[in-house]
């Protein structure tokens, strides 16, 4: 039986998320409260368009319900962190109404010294069980934020994730591609050399592609474009644009590359180079939930996404607190396709 990962814009059954609890990312009560408010804002925005299930840790149901309201489903499971894109399963379908869940190996984004993943490594199987989806186990260390597909055979990847020594030492590029293609039903991999500069900080993923580039439809990719030469991502984004403009997808189409200007802010509240990116958005049934940063370019980005998704409502949600923890809106959501 052949499975494939549908594109994010295909119809969803629901969205899965994970509720923030006390951990290495949210180290004090103020940070945790801010994270929970931010996650709740995203969940409520997505719930306008489709069902949402929030996985929460023991004893956290009351707080979750208070912030999420009555319309988000709650499920209790042990968690280490709250990035469902990475710890949850990658759902795939067989085109005949069958659903399955790819369970990648999760090791804390390359076995980082601060990360704990005893419970998160099991979440993909828990979610698959709740979705009544058989599990397709993979030996590849990988996360959902490290892949993006067009639904027609093409997948975006980055060298520093799948080929990184902390994840898959000893794997060749060809071996990684073979495993990705076998699980996602893809045939063509487009590799970028790395992620944004800020993604290599203490709580970074070491190069996830979903903050850099994403398919908006077959043949069209949105790309983070840092226009300010003072920012280290200026040179990086120029390289991404050059690579993607020179590539063709699985159908032989030369990619249409849509530049999405980065926010104008250059440094975050900690004084570090900001990796704020509008690329880390989430497409759901009838909607696009887009990161906002209190920045003049927020509405510019919203306009670009409205043109790309004219049939969907674009909703801006402040994502600065999420980015402070190491990710964005796409990182905390995981779609279950409708079958």
UniProtKB/Swiss-Prot annotation:
Highest taxon of the lineage: Bacteria
Catalytic activities: agmatine + H2O = N-carbamoylputrescine + NH4(+)
The record's top EC class is: hydrolase
**GO BP, one example?**
putrescine biosynthetic process
What are the protein's UniProt keywords?
Hydrolase
> What protein is this chain from?
Putative agmatine deiminase
An example Pfam family from this entry, by short name, is PAD_porph
Belongs to which family?
A: Belongs to the agmatine deiminase family.
Which EC number(s) does UniProt give?
A: 3.5.3.12
Single annotated GO MF:
agmatine deiminase activity
Cross-referenced PANTHER family = AGMATINE DEIMINASE-RELATED (PTHR31377:SF0)
Which residues carry out catalysis? Answer: 331 (amidino-cysteine intermediate)
